[in-house]
């Protein structure tokens, strides 16, 4: 399943970028609430994800949607949901 491969790569990136133990990173983990990733580390993680997958995560748009109450933080910041969004962006780019 592609989400698993995507999750494994994203979890590796998070572990490398934030020094969080790879074993503690789960698909259900919330990057902020559960893993304690701060905004600067998250920007580094997003940059690494963009580079790894050849996509551009619309972080400004996502943040705005969360701040305006259009979506919950879980929509974008729980890893299994983030990985699904990454796969959607990859599919859209592939056409």
From Swiss-Prot:
Pathway: Glycolipid biosynthesis; KDO(2)-lipid A biosynthesis. InterPro entries: ACP, ACP-like_sf, PP-bd_ACP, Ppantetheine_attach_site. GO terms for biological process: Kdo2-lipid A biosynthetic process; lipid A biosynthetic process. The keyword Transmembrane does not apply. It comes from the Bacteria. It is found in: Cytoplasm. Residues 4-90 form the Carrier domain. 4'-phosphopantetheine is transferred from CoA to a specific serine of apo-ACP by AcpS. This modification is essential for activity because fatty acids are bound in thioester linkage to the sulfhydryl of the prosthetic group. One of its GO terms (molecular function) is acyl carrier activity. The keyword Transmembrane helix does not apply. The modification O-(pantetheine 4'-phosphoryl)serine is found at residue 39. One of its GO terms (cellular component) is membrane. Keywords: Cytoplasm, Fatty acid biosynthesis, Fatty acid metabolism, Lipid A biosynthesis, Lipid biosynthesis, Lipid metabolism, Phosphopantetheine, Phosphoprotein. Its main location: cytoplasm. Carrier of the growing fatty acid chain in fatty acid biosynthesis. Is involved in the transfer of long hydroxylated fatty acids to lipid A. This is Acyl carrier protein AcpXL. It comes from Rhizobium meliloti (strain 1021) (Ensifer meliloti). The gene is acpXL.
């Amino acid at each position: 399943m592609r989400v698993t491969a995507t999750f494994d790569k994203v979890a590796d990136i998070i572990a490398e970028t934030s020094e969080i133990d790879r074993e503690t990173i789960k698909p259900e983990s919330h990057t902020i609430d559960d893993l304690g990733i701060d905004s600067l580390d998250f920007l580094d993680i997003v940059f690494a994800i963009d580079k790894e997958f050849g996509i551009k995560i619309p972080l400004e748009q996502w943040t705005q949607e969360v701040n305006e109450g259009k979506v919950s933080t879980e929509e974008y910041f729980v890893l299994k949901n983030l990985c699904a969004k990454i796969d959607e962006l990859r599919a859209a780019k592939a056409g």
